[in-house]
Each structure stands twice: as C-alpha cells, then as structure tokens.
C-alpha cells in the first residue's frame, strides 16, 4: 500500500449521460457520464459496448448462482442492480521489470462491486492472499477468473469474503495484458444484509475490519471510496474536496 503501481490502463464505464452536479449532489454523481472514445479507433466503441453487455449477462448469471448458494431466490440482488447497474471495464497493460522501478503491478486490494469477471492473457502475475501469504492464480486458457467483491461480502455479512489480490510485475522483456470487468449495484442503492439459512448464518464471520478500507452499505459511497484510494493523483486534481486529511496527504505524496 502507498507504493506507485506500474501499469497502463484505459477505464471505460457505462455509456450514460452525466448527472447534474451542485453543492448538494451526492459525491457518486461524479462516477457517471459518457466515455471519451478515441477518434483514431472508430470501431472501439461498438466492440467495447458489446463486450460490456455480454460480461454483464455473465455477471448476472453468476450472481443468481451465488444467491441460490446462499439459500436465496435467484433474483434477490435485482432490487439493488436494476435498472442501471454500475460497472467498469479496464484494459490494462503491465510492462516487464526492465521498464519499471518496483515489482508492484497493482497493489493489494479488494474490488468494490458484486464481482469481477477477469479476462487475462497467458502471462502469470495475479496473486491472491491466503493465510497471511500469497498464492498464484495462473491463467487457464479459455476461462475467466471471478473475484468476489465487497457488495457480496456486505450482503452475506462476511460469509462470502471479497478476496484481497494483487498483480506482480512480469519478467523483463515481457508484458501482461488483462481486461477486468467490475459489475456492481446501482450507485443510489443500499446493500441489504441477507437472512441466511441457519447452517450458513452460523458460519458468517462478520465484515472485514480495515481502517484503511472501510466497507459501506451505501453503494455510491463505497465505489467513490475505492476510486479515491486507487487513483490518488486523479483524486487530488479533480476531487480534492472529497479527500479527508489522510487521503489528501497520500495523494500529495504521489502527485
């Protein structure tokens, strides 16, 4: 934590109109708006929007499976993601060690939404925290990696845990490409705590306690928290009014 990541990425959210902003607007209004499509790649918009639609459909199928595994109706989560789920696609390139200053491709973190659908190339680098250490999650051809996010941890009262993961820099002379799709609830929604069957409720662990990454049932607040933490230099430039003293100090250190 607190180290500079070594990666290049393009963030592409849901293609929607920007929301009005005034001093009384919720901070999460800033997370919604149209994307900036490069004129040099005229076909990019259509390809990305089709991929987002397909990844959303897959994420919803996974959510229905999680819901049933938790003893709930398959559509239990619809109330907080319809009609406009919040989602984000990233296209990420991690350069090799000969072009970076540290081994940190991206630091240890959790994903803030329901779940993440991760497409990656054949270059290893993804690691998941387990029992105080790190285990590799090597690529498997023809598959996606599914990460549990903070919304599922909140809804299940910790029965499901948002997994902490990171990416280490690939070897010199190589690079790593990945395309994570983060599927979340509506920004104006509040995450309910599900009434789990007794046999599952007895095994809940409560929410993870981390002063540097508190979990909020307010979906918009939880997403904004993650964005401010993930991109402190951007936060300082465009959202300094939202930073607390600790966040402001961290952002200034990376500016």
Model-identified regions with their sequence ranges:
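Non-heme Fe(II)-dependent double-stranded beta-helix
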Residues: 1-51
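C-terminal flanking tails of non-heme Fe-dependent oxygenases
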Residues: 1-3, 31, 42, 49-50, ...
């Amino acid at each position: 934590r607190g180290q500079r990541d070594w990666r290049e990425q393009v963030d592409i959210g849901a293609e929607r109109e920007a929301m009005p902003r005034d001093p009384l607007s919720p901070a999460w209004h800033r997370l919604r708006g149209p994307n900036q499509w490069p004129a040099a790649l005229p076909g990019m918009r259509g390809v990305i929007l089709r991929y987002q639609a397909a990844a959303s459909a897959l994420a919803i199928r996974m959510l229905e499976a999680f819901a049933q595994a938790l003893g709930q109706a398959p559509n239990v989560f619809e109330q907080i993601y319809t009609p406009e789920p919040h989602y984000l696609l990233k296209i990420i390139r991690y350069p090799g060690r000969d072009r970076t200053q540290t081994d940190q491709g991206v630091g240890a973190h959790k994903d803030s939404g329901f779940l993440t659908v991760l497409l990656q190339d054949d270059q290893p680098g993804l690691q998941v925290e387990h029992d105080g250490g790190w285990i590799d999650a090597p690529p498997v051809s023809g598959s996606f990696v599914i990460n549990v996010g903070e919304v599922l941890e909140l809804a299940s009262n910790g029965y499901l845990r948002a997994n902490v993961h990171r990416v280490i820099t690939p070897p010199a002379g190589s690079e790593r490409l990945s395309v994570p799709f983060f599927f979340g609830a509506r920004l104006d929604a509040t995450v309910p705590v599900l009434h789990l069957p007794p046999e599952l409720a007895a095994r809940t662990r409560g929410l993870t306690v981390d002063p540097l990454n508190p979990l909020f049932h307010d979906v918009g607040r939880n997403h904004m928290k993650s964005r401010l933490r993930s991109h402190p230099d951007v936060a300082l430039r465009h959202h300094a009014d939202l930073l607390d003293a600790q966040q402001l100090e961290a952002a200034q250190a990376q500016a």
